[in-house]
From Swiss-Prot:
It is a single-pass type II membrane protein. It comes from Pongo abelii. Residues 1-20 are cytoplasmic. Signal peptide: none annotated. Belongs to the glycosyltransferase 31 family. PANTHER family: BETA-1,3-N-ACETYLGLUCOSAMINYLTRANSFERASE, UDP-GALNAC:BETA-1,3-N-ACETYLGALACTOSAMINYLTRANSFERASE 1. This is UDP-GalNAc:beta-1,3-N-acetylgalactosaminyltransferase 1. GO terms for cellular component: Golgi membrane. Transfers N-acetylgalactosamine onto globotriaosylceramide. Plays a critical role in preimplantation stage embryonic development. Glycans are attached at N72, N154, N198, N212, N326. Coiled coil: none annotated. It is an enzyme of class 2 (transferase). Residues 44-331 are lumenal. Pathway: Protein modification; protein glycosylation.
Length: 331
C-alpha cells in the first residue's frame, strides 16, 4: 500500500511540473511573438521639440461647436474660468460639481465661472441620453460641446477645444484652469493662491511631472507608441488632474496647437507646446497643493489643498459638506 502511494505521488508531481513547464513555455512563446511583432524603433535619447513642429498650421482643428454657454463670456471679465472635461453620460459627476465646488460664482468679489467640456456620444448613442443632455444644457447653460467623438483617445481634442473656446469666446478671463470630473477643487484656496501671485503673465502651474518616462508596456491607457512619441522622456508638464494658466498663455498655446500634431496624452501635448514656446512650468513651493494619486484625505487636509484627484461624485459631495463645517484645524 505504502509502496503504491509513493509510486503515485512522484508521477503526480512530475505531471504537475510538466504542466507548469508547458504553461511557462507558452507564456514565453507569447512574449517572444509579441516582441517580434512590434515595429522596432530606436528610442531617441536626446529630445528635440522641433520634431513635433510644422511651420504651417496643418493641425488646426475645425470641429463645430454644437453646444455653447448661455452667458456671453466675451462680455464678461471673470477672474477665473474652470473648464472640466466630462463624458456625456457623466450626469451625476457634473451635478455633484454644480452643488459643491462649482456652485459659488463669486469669491470675495472675484468672479469664478465653471463649464463642462464634452464631445459627441458614439453613433449608437442612446437617443434619450442625447435628449437629456440637451435638457441639461437648457437648464444650466454650462456645457461646451464639439462634434468630435467623445473617447479617451480624443481627450486631446477636448483640450484643444478648451483653448479655442477661451481664445474666441472668453478672452478676458484672467486665469484659466482645466480639470476633470473626478477631481476635488478647493475653489476658495485656488482663488487665494492666484490672488497672492507676484506675477500674472507667462504663468503655468499644477502638479509638475519632470523627467517622466514614456511607457511602452501592455497597459493601453498609459501606453504610447514609438510612432506617436519617439523620445524616452516626456517634456516637463503638469498632470491633467488640474493645471492653471494666465490669460496671455491661452491664445499662444492655442496658436501653437495648430502647428503640433495631437498625441494621445493631452497634458503631455500641452507640455510640448509650452516647451516650443519656451515657457517654464511654475513649481508650487507648497508640495501639498495638488494630489495626483488617490489618498485618504481628512477635512483639515482638504482645507489646505487646491486640487485632489480620484474622487467619486458621492465623495465630492460628502467631503465638501464636511469641509464647510466649523471644524477646528491645528496646522
Amino acid at each position: 500500500m505504502a509502496s503504491a502511494l509513493w509510486t503515485v505521488l512522484p508521477s503526480r508531481m512530475s505531471l504537475r511540473s510538466l504542466q507548469w513547464s508547458l504553461l511557462l513555455l507558452s507564456l514565453l512563446s507569447f512574449l517572444v511573438m509579441w516582441y517580434l511583432s512590434l515595429p522596432h524603433y530606436n528610442v531617441i535619447e536626446r529630445v528635440n521639440w522641433m520634431y513635433f513642429y510644422e511651420y504651417e498650421p496643418i493641425y488646426r482643428q475645425d470641429f463645430h461647436f454644437t453646444l455653447r454657454e448661455h452667458s456671453n463670456c466675451s462680455h464678461q471679465n471673470p477672474f477665473l474660468v474652470i473648464l472640466v472635461t466630462s463624458h456625456p453620460s457623466d450626469v451625476k459627476a457634473r451635478q455633484a460639481i454644480r452643488v459643491t465646488w462649482g456652485e459659488k460664482k463669486s469669491w470675495w468679489g472675484y468672479e469664478v465661472l465653471t463649464f463642462f467640456l464634452l464631445g459627441q456620444e458614439a453613433e449608437k448613442e442612446d437617443k434619450m441620453l442625447a435628449l437629456s443632455l440637451e435638457d441639461e444644457h437648457l437648464l444650466y447653460g454650462d456645457i461646451i460641446r464639439q462634434d468630435f467623438l467623445d473617447t479617451y483617445n480624443n481627450l486631446t481634442l477636448k483640450t484643444i477645444m478648451a483653448f479655442r473656446w477661451v481664445t474666441e469666446f472668453c478672452p478676458n478671463a484672467k486665469y484659466v484652469m482645466k480639470t476633470d470630473t473626478d477631481v476635488f477643487i478647493n475653489t476658495g484656496n485656488l482663488v487665494k493662491y492666484l490672488l497672492n501671485l507676484n506675477h500674472s503673465e507667462k504663468f503655468f502651474t499644477g502638479y509638475p511631472l519632470i523627467d517622466n518616462y514614456s511607457y511602452r508596456g501592455f497597459y493601453q491607457k498609459t501606453h504610447i507608441s514609438y510612432q506617436e512619441y519617439p523620445f524616452k522622456v516626456f517634456p516637463p508638464y503638469c498632470s491633467g488632474l488640474g493645471y492653471i494658466m494666465s490669460r496671455d498663455l491661452v491664445p499662444r498655446i492655442y496658436e501653437m496647437m495648430g502647428h503640433v500634431k495631437p498625441i494621445k496624452f493631452e497634458d503631455v501635448y500641452v507640455g510640448i507646446c509650452l516647451n516650443l514656446l519656451k515657457v517654464n512650468i511654475h513649481i508650487p513651493e507648497d508640495t501639498n497643493l495638488f494630489f495626483l494619486y488617490r489618498i485618504h484625505l481628512d477635512v483639515c487636509q482638504l482645507r489646505r489643498v487646491i486640487a485632489a484627484h480620484g474622487f467619486s461624485s458621492k465623495e465630492i459631495i460628502t467631503f465638501w459638506q464636511v469641509m464647510l463645517r466649523n471644524t477646528t484645524c491645528h496646522y
